Swiss-Prot record:
Name of the protein: Elongation factor P--(R)-beta-lysine ligase
Residue stretches spanning the membrane: none
GO CC, one annotated term: cytosol
Subunit structure: Homodimer.
InterPro entries from the UniProt entry: Aa-tRNA-synt_II (IPR004364), aa-tRNA-synth_II (IPR006195), aa-tRNA-synth_II/BPL/LPL (IPR045864), EpmA (IPR004525), Lys-tRNA-synth_II_C (IPR018149)
PANTHER family listed in its UniProt record: ELONGATION FACTOR P--(R)-BETA-LYSINE LIGASE (PTHR42918:SF6), LYSYL-TRNA SYNTHETASE (PTHR42918)
The family this protein is said to belong to: Belongs to the class-II aminoacyl-tRNA synthetase family. EpmA subfamily.
Originating organism: Salmonella arizonae (strain ATCC BAA-731 / CDC346-86 / RSK2980)
Gene name linked to the record: epmA
Keywords, ordered alphabetically: ATP-binding, Ligase, Nucleotide-binding
């Protein structure tokens, strides 16, 4: 394909046909298990507060809103899907577009396809097993292995991420030759993420998918804190062949705790000179009304298809990446 023929799709037609077959297979997987497919908005009046996520923003100027209404493209359908759970929809899944105003590259595109699903009355481990089932079916891979976040750091970096102070984390960073980044970073979780990315990720999920679970409580996001060890959150991620595929939680259902986390995120954003984001009060109201105890997971479909097809980059499995959009 000519480099100058930018009207043409990024992916080949055979790859797009294979992608369509995988989408059908995913829907069949959930239909066979009685999980309802839902559709939720791509835009919202509120957005994520996470300091590491950057949403696209637009304005609605239609009738009744001549002064304009700020809207955000969804980085994930999570908040709307949790409102459906609180309304009594039962187990739900969604295949949808998500948007993040971040990087573009081998594994990233600002517009991407997300598979997200929620299972009432599932704990984190039961959902991990279901994710493993889906990966084996779509990728024809071996059953996954599991490591706690603590075990992964101890195995590959010989450091305990739950007890190490920032000086010890910087010493570990020096051994990985990333002191130029670590020495000026004051946020402990950012240091941990740096070490995980550089020192752990390259060593896991090579032959089979690998689940990393029980992230530090400070990285709980929307997950519950473990009742067995308050230092960790009921959160997991799964990696395969150098790619992060999914991020899952035993979901937080306490509205007050969730609001406190949103507010803490905004304080961190302010400290970093980032804009504070509007908190989703609809989600908080849904939690107050009573969302069932559940676990949920978000999985990057484009990355899944890339692995299934043995492709080298997302552009090989997306019809039009942002540079051709």
């Amino acid at each position: 394909m000519s480099e100058t023929a930018t009207w043409q799709p990024s992916a080949s037609v055979p790859n797009l046909l294979k992608r369509a077959a995988i989408m059908t297979e995913i829907r069949r997987f959930f239909a066979d298990r009685g999980v309802l497919e839902v559709e939720t908005p791509c835009m919202s009046q509120a957005t994520v507060t996470d300091i590491h996520l950057f949403p696209f923003e637009t304005r609605f100027v239609g009738p009744g809103h001549s002064q304009g209404m700020n809207l955000y493209l969804m980085t994930s359908p999570e908040y709307h899907m949790k409102r459906l759970l609180a309304a009594g929809c039962g187990p739900v899944f969604q295949l949808c577009r998500s948007f993040r105003n971040e990087e573009m590259g081998r594994y990233h595109n600002p517009e991407f396809t997300m598979l997200e699903w929620y299972r009432p009355h599932y704990d984190m481990y039961r959902l991990m097993n279901e994710v493993d089932d889906l990966l084996q079916q779509v990728l024809d891979c071996q059953p996954a292995e599991s490591l706690s976040y603590q075990q992964a750091f101890q195995r590959h970096l010989e450091i305990d991420p739950l007890s190490a102070d920032k000086t010890q984390l910087r010493e570990a960073a020096a051994k990985l030759d990333v002191s130029n980044i670590a020495d000026t970073e004051e946020d402990r979780d950012t240091l941990l993420q740096l070490l995980f990315t550089v020192g752990v990720e390259p060593h896991i999920g090579k032959e089979k998918p690998t689940f990393i679970y029980h992230f530090p409580a400070s990285q709980a996001s929307l997950a519950q804190i473990s009742t067995e060890d308050h230092r960790v959150a009921e959160r997991f991620e799964v990696y395969y062949k150098g790619i992060e595929l999914a991020n899952g939680f035993h979901e937080l259902t306490d509205a007050r705790e969730q609001q406190q986390r949103f507010e803490q995120d905004n304080r961190k954003r302010a400290a970093r000179g980032l804009p504070q984001q509007p908190i989703d009060n609809h989600l908080l109201d849904a939690l107050k009304a009573g969302m069932p105890d559940c676990s949920g997971v978000a999985l990057g479909v484009d990355r899944l298809v890339m692995l299934a097809l043995g492709a080298e980059r997302l552009a090989d499995v997306i019809a039009f990446t942002v540079d051709r959009a």
